[in-house]
A protein has these predicted regions:
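Amphipathic coiled-coil/heptad-repeat helices and related helical stalk/stem segments
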Residues: 26, 46-49, 72, 104, ...
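Long, well-ordered mid-to-C-terminal structural blocks that present hydrophobic/aromatic surfaces
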Residues: 59, 63-67, 84-87
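C-terminal cap of metal-dependent C-N hydrolases
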Residues: 173-203
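Catalytic beta/alpha-barrel core
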Residues: 41-45, 63-71, 91-96
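Glycine-rich nucleotide phosphate-binding loop and flanking beta-alpha elements
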Residues: 48, 94, 187-188
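Active-site environment of divalent metal-dependent phosphoester hydrolases
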Residues: 47-51, 69-76, 126-128
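Polyanionic/metal-chelating signatures
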Residues: 1-64, 192, 198
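His/Asp/Glu-enriched, well-ordered alpha-helical/loop segment
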Residues: 39, 77-80, 85, 89-93, ...
C-alpha cells in the first residue's frame, strides 16, 4: 500500500537499505508521483495489461498516463471511465510484437469516441529525434477520420494539460507567446514554417 511505499523509500533515502536497484533520483521521482505532483507514465500495449495498470493506479490513488497503448481501443470505455489520458502514435498501427497484435489505425478514433484525452508523438526515433513529425501523425489521424480540432489539440494543448504545464500549449492572455506561422495547413506533409516566435521573440 501507499504507506509501505513511503516507508520503503524513506528507508532508502536515509541509507538503511542496500538491496534496491534504483537510484535516489528514481525514488525522488516516485515520491512526486505518490504526492500527486506528477503523473506516472507507463508504457503498455496489451489490453489486459492496460486494465491491470488502471486497477493499480486506482488502488494507489496516483495519476496515470498511458504511453503507446496499441490495444487501448479494446478497453477505451474503461480508460475513459478512469479519466486516464493516452500518449500514442496514430501511425503505429502495425503489430510489432505479440503485445500489440490488435494494433489498428482506428485506435485514435475509438479512444476519441469514448472521450479519452490523447496526445500524439512520433514513435519512429529515439527520444525526441524526429519529434517534429508529430504533425504528420496528427495529419494522418485526420485522414483516418479524427476531428481536425481534436488532432490539433493532441499536439498542442493536450500535452500541456496532461503534464500540468501552465501557460503553454494554447494562445490565450497571460500564456507564453510561443507561435508558429505556417505557409499552409500545419498538418499537411509539404507545409513549411514561415516564422517562429518563442516568448514573443522572432527566431
Amino acid at each position: 500500500n501507499k504507506d509501505d511505499n513511503y516507508a520503503d523509500m524513506t528507508q532508502f533515502m536515509i541509507g538503511t537499505a542496500n538491496d534496491y536497484k534504483f537510484t535516489s533520483r528514481d525514488f525522488k521521482a516516485l515520491l512526486k508521483v505518490l504526492n500527486g505532483e506528477i503523473p506516472l507514465v507507463v508504457e503498455v500495449s496489451r489490453a489486459t495489461d492496460i486494465l491491470n495498470i488502471l486497477k493499480f493506479s486506482e488502488s494507489q490513488q496516483i495519476d496515470l498516463v498511458l504511453w503507446g497503448a496499441a490495444e487501448a481501443h479494446m478497453v477505451a470505455d474503461e480508460i475513459a471511465k478512469a479519466d486516464v489520458p493516452v500518449i500514442l502514435d496514430p501511425l503505429d498501427n502495425v503489430p510489432r510484437t505479440f503485445d500489440s497484435l490488435n494494433s489498428t489505425y482506428e485506435n485514435v478514433i475509438r479512444l476519441d469516441q469514448a472521450g479519452v484525452k490523447m496526445a500524439f508523438y512520433y514513435s519512429q526515433g529515439a527520444g525526441s529525434h524526429n519529434a517534429y513529425l508529430a504533425t504528420q501523425s496528427a495529419g494522418n489521424s485526420v485522414a483516418m477520420g479524427l476531428d481536425y480540432i481534436t488532432a490539433m489539440k493532441s499536439i498542442t494543448s493536450n500535452p500541456a494539460d496532461i503534464f500540468g504545464l501552465v501557460g503553454v500549449g494554447s494562445l490565450a492572455p497571460g500564456f507564453d507567446a510561443d507561435l508558429v506561422i505556417w505557409d499552409d495547413d500545419p498538418l499537411e506533409l509539404m507545409t513549411n514554417v514561415d516564422n517562429l516566435l518563442v516568448d514573443g521573440i522572432d527566431q
